[in-house]
Amino acid sequence: MIALLTGKLAHKSPDFIILDVNGVGYRVQIPFSTYYALPEGGSSVSLNIFTHVKEDAINLYGFRTMEEKEMFQLLISVSGIGPKLGNGILSNIEAQNLSDALIRGDLARLATIPGIGKKTAERLVLELREKVKKLGHGPLQQDVAPADAHNDMRDDVVSALVNLGYKEAVVQKTVDEIGVAADATVESLLKQALKKLMK
């Protein structure tokens, strides 16, 4: 079972990376929080890995911290929460903020996450509140870009948000409302779009 990978960042996108480990490329799915923390392509990185084995595939999920990985494992231990949704949850809320919401029983906050309705939010609090406490997780404390860069960035952000469960038409409208400044990055646009979508 793979628990940690260290290698060269061969490819970086909002929902997955390819990590070159001694000439072997590993496709690793990641939450946005990990994406934001990654250096530029070609850099050496280490990620905590969760290996999900299915009958027809082996999927790797990577996290910048053990806290994120532990939270992911807690999430997928809940009935109805698979790895894809667990990853999506951590893309919408930082692990420490999620811990805080679970401990406080903040159903309203949890229910704003795509794929999490009221019943699922209640189940998360019921099943994970005490487990999170034991882990000790606490709360956290424009110019126009060139057309090609604008379109590429916009497409990346729209694709990433649609993969998280947001409707494409809503995402496109939100991203267009934000606009793309000359110094904008995919990370900054994702943060702005998520902030608007989660209101």
Curated annotation (Swiss-Prot):
Stretches the record annotates as Flexible linker: 144-148
Q: Where is this region: Domain III?
A: 149-199
Spell out the residue ranges making up region: Domain II. Answer: 65-143
Q: Where is this region: Domain I?
A: 1-64
As for subcellular location, the record says: Cytoplasm
UniProt name for this protein:
Holliday junction branch migration complex subunit RuvA
Which keywords annotate this record? Answer: Cytoplasm, DNA damage, DNA recombination, DNA repair, DNA-binding
Q: Which GO terms describe its molecular function?
A: ATP binding; four-way junction DNA binding; four-way junction helicase activity
Family designation: Belongs to the RuvA family.
In the UniProt record, the gene name given for this protein reads ruvA
